[in-house]
Design a protein with these regions (language model features):
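N-terminal secretory targeting modules
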Residues: 1-48, 106
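Generic structural signal for beta-strand residues in well-ordered domains
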Residues: 39-40, 76, 142
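Residue-level signal for beta-strand positions within conserved beta-sheet cores that form or flank
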Residues: 43, 79, 145
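Conserved SGNH/GDSL esterase-like catalytic core that processes O-acyl groups on lipids
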Residues: 46-48, 54-131
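Alpha-helical cap/lid subdomain in secreted, periplasmic
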Residues: 101-190
Length: 190
């Protein structure tokens, strides 16, 4: 309820700031590099990474420097890793859910998700977002039977340099509330 009140009270400023941010903030490309493959030696491990621009690695030039590359560097001396990166800049939780419907049913040992920033920019309430997260995790469980699922939290959007206040503050409040909901959901899974 409070998010509706905050959002409604700030609508004139948010609309202006949102337009200015969208117009003036450069769009970074997703990094080049393999999104599907095998790397390393040792015990077999299958990895699926799902999400938005953070999962895709936006902000670096090559996948070797992104989340996927960092994980492969750390684990490839002990594991033969079959990896699959299914992440797209701008994706919301709904879009991630739709994208995994196109994947074959198979087993992944580990699944990492990173999604939520774009849900915030669409003003998805924390309650609606966590409901979508629960739906996502049920689909992941049923379709891929992972041994481990790792949920990345939403970054502190109030600290994004491209966002002016009060837009940064409002998005930061959404992020904090969503991370709290996500933490409670994850704690119930163990």
């Amino acid at each position: 309820m409070r998010f509706k009140i905050y959002t409604l009270a700030l609508i004139p400023v948010i609309l202006f700031q949102g337009y200015a941010v969208k117009k003036n903030t450069p769009r970074l490309a997703e990094p080049k590099g393999e999104r599907i493959g095998q790397k390393g030696v040792g015990k077999s491990l299958s990895l699926l990474i799902l999400g938005d621009s953070a999962a895709a690695g936006v902000g670096v030039n090559v996948q070797d420097d992104a989340l996927l590359g960092s994980i492969l560097k750390e684990l490839s001396s002990e594991f033969s890793i079959q990896f699959y990166l299914q992440a797209t800049t701008g994706f919301t939780t709904d879009q991630v859910i739709r994208s995994i419907q196109t994947l074959e049913t198979q087993h992944f040992d580990v699944i990492i998700t990173s999604v939520g920033v774009n849900d915030i920019t669409k003003f998805t309430s924390p309650q609606a977002w966590i409901a979508k997260q629960k739906q996502l995790y049920q689909i992941l469980k049923n379709k891929f039977s992972p041994q481990l699922t790792i949920a990345s939290g939403i970054p502190p959007m109030d600290q994004f340099p491209a966002l002016p206040n009060p837009l940064a503050w409002l998005f930061g409040q959404y992020a904090k509330a969503m991370n709290l909901e996500l933490g409670q959901f994850v704690a119930q899974q163990n």
